[in-house]
Amino acid sequence: MKRNALVFIAVLLFLAFFAWAGWANLNHRSQAARCLLASTAPRGLGSANGGAARYVSPLQGKPAPAFTLEDLSGKKVSLADYKGKALVLNFWATWCAPCRIETPWLIDLRNRYAAQGFEVLAISADDLDRRNPTRLSSEKRQIARFVQQMQMPYPVLIDADSISKPYGGLDALPTSFFVDRKGTIVAAQLGLTSKAEIEANIRKALGANQ
């Protein structure tokens, strides 16, 4: 009887391991697909110049949807806190390889245009398990390590999934929305483009091209 119980427990553990492995593999593939989509041409993309697709968001010309998120310290940060500034709302994740390429460009451009009233809000799309405080703390530390490693000087917010719907679903990463001083989205970029294109859209948000 005791031996049967041990065998039963062993089978349960075996099945639990494979269930976890299957979930982890599916999650990894889902993350990879979101980055892979960045180099394809989904709906809303116009003609490409030099291989970089130009994205036309349905939100362009409309007010940026309001939100309130937490930063890594737990402080509440709202879009309204940056009223009167030109912004890039940059949706990214620690596991996103194109985001790792793009981040140094954003850092340089932020430092270059900050004196003109420009800021980057980096909104992490990393998964957060709020039902498990231990896991949540570990996930936040992972994001914080990335931020420290990349020396990101601008605000970093978490839980992008909670605001993904009003911003069009965030089918690919990185995704950026360029917001002018009046709070209107003047441009958007889906996936990795180029530093020059990011700078051009920052200047548009600042009104430098008008």
Language model features: what each stretch is:
Residues 100-150, 160-166, 200:
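Structural microenvironment flanking redox-active thiols in thiol-disulfide oxidoreductases
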Residues 146-206:
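Thiol/disulfide oxidoreductase modules built on the thioredoxin-like
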